[in-house]
Amino acid sequence: MYKRVLLKLSGEVLSGEGEKGFNHENIIYLVDELKKILEYGTNVGIVIGAGNLFRGREMQELSPTIADQIGMLGTVINALYLKDIFEKNNLRTVVVSQVSSLPSIRPIHYDDINLYFDAGYLVIFAGGTSNPFFTTDTAAALRAVEMKADILIKGTKVDGIYDKDPKKFTDARKFDTLTYDEAIDKGLKIMDTEAFSICKRYDMKILVMDFFKESNLLSAVREENVGTLVVPK
């Protein structure tokens, strides 16, 4: 049983695939899945993307620096939205960030993070890495290491890592486990290069799993055979 996990989710989890904004049904599903693992006393940190609000690659007229900063603020909007919904559903939540000083957001101090976890709070890390040119995958890797997570769980729309796109190839083969070196040798795209490098350097395990299969997150935290586990060796 993992006692401390970092959960990385895309903004699409909040809106639905290909949609924008917030889908209440999706968010209540997220609430229910989180409640299942919090009942076991697992500490949960969350990094959420902002694709439900803004995608920089769709705004070619913007400079990359400005587009990335807008994306960072998008993650702050998502974090505050989740905090309010979570707390209305009896999930104590704190949002921490290095890019915002709004009254509902606290600065990131890692001594405080442990206190939040000890007090039973969910911790949402907003604002990415606080620097442009880095993805929320990289932010998730960084926060997972900093909060001393047992594992980084990447919730996706597919049930793991395949040798090729399972939507295009019926003979695609799913991996149950991989080492970092095997993933690199096979050219598998698990996270962006910077995120993968951080996890590899600090021996952070990564689990890629289907977040939309009910109770999959609980199975993952119980260390059951779910998704694809990427391990140091």
UniProtKB/Swiss-Prot annotation:
Reaction(s) this enzyme catalyzes, per UniProt: UMP + ATP = UDP + ADP
Pfam families: AA_kinase (PF00696)
InterPro entries in alphabetical order: AceGlu_kinase-like_sf (IPR036393), Asp/Glu/Uridylate_kinase (IPR001048), Uridylate_kinase (IPR011817), Uridylate_kinase_bac (IPR015963)
Enzyme's top EC category: transferase
Disulfide bonds: none
Binding annotation for ATP: 8-11, 51, 55, 156, 162, 165
Keyword Iron included in the entry's annotation: no
UniProt function note: Catalyzes the reversible phosphorylation of UMP to UDP.
Name of this protein: Uridylate kinase
Organism encoding this protein: Thermosipho melanesiensis (strain DSM 12029 / CIP 104789 / BI429)
Gene: pyrH
